[in-house]
């Protein structure tokens, strides 16, 4: 008697981009427009942690460390040393680069499917507008430009303009 043929199981596909994969149990103040505490699927996007460091400030409402005002923090702050490498969150194109009083030196990457990552307080930008970058490729260096209490990466993630909590998608060093 012949043995039964081996069963081949396909890898399950990632949920479609934009699918809610974790509904947050959030009971705090009303969120600003275009912000969510839910985890949203990024589909098949292959991602990396741009800077492995300690989480210095969460996404969400907080007392601002400089002005003391209670307001929403659009991203996460990841601690690092001045000049540490910041890698691209995923393959993408440099959407824009710039400098202002709040964010200091900053850049945004477009990863397609409405997914964008934003990096602020950099000491140096290592890319130019329109440049293609690979996941993990050096795009900037950690700094404390703009309104900052010390060297760190301020990282924001968006899907079709909806701000996401980056902590769902990156790793941190434990305390």
Model-predicted segments: where are they?
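Zn2+-dependent peptidoglycan hydrolase active-site motif and core
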Residues: 71-74, 88-126, 151, 156
